[in-house]
Amino acid sequence: MGGAQVLVLMTLLGTPPVTTGTPPVVVDPSVAVVGPPLGLGGGGRPPCRPINVTVAVEKDECPQCMAVTTTACGGYCRTREPVYRSPLGRPPQSSCTYGALRYERWALWGCPIGSDPRVLLPVALSCRCARCPIATSDCTVQGLGPAFCGAPGGFGIGE
């Protein structure tokens, strides 16, 4: 595998704020818009925003994982579904993705001498609704998995 792997272990920490929903609004006869304008959440769904997540960080050469709490992007974005087939194709769909981010450096413990224990993790500073950047993101409905620590030593907590 090589390199560091970051796996989502837990999703939201705490209770997300709930927004009030609005019924679908038709902007153009060919496109139905679901949710409130500007990509905000709707129907009781939280809008696209930075959320706290706990991830499992591991490297092949280090015997244990480390649970790290960081900030990622999560929430709902406005979607458009065509009412009829347009010769121009389907409208682009947006997803909640990073607006601005920085990287934090973490050091794994228990790594053998001579190996690099450092891992860089992205931290969301802001989020936006945009087309999913497939070159840098997992744009699937479900992640590529597995959502657990693969190191034989686990987290080393209480073991």
Curated annotation (Swiss-Prot):
Alphabetical list of PANTHER family matching this protein: GLYCOPROTEIN HORMONE BETA CHAIN, LUTROPIN SUBUNIT BETA
Protein location: Secreted
Task performed by this protein: Promotes spermatogenesis and ovulation by stimulating the testes and ovaries to synthesize steroids.
Family: Belongs to the glycoprotein hormones subunit beta family.
Protein name: Lutropin subunit beta
Biological process annotations from GO: estradiol secretion; G protein-coupled receptor signaling pathway; response to light stimulus
Molecular function per GO: hormone activity
Pfam families on file: Cys_knot
Record's keyword terms, sorted: Disulfide bond, Glycoprotein, Hormone, Secreted, Signal
Keyword Electron transport in annotation: no
CDD domains according to UniProt: GHB_like (cd00069)
Residues spanning the signal sequence: 1-39
UniProt KW Transferase keyword: no
Oligomeric and partner information: Heterodimer of a common alpha chain and a unique beta chain which confers biological specificity to thyrotropin, lutropin, follitropin and gonadotropin.
Glycosylation sites: N52
Gene3D superfamilies: Cystine-knot cytokines
Cystines in this chain: C48-C96, C62-C111, C65-C149, C73-C127, C77-C129, C132-C139
Gene Ontology cellular-component terms listed: cytoplasm; extracellular space
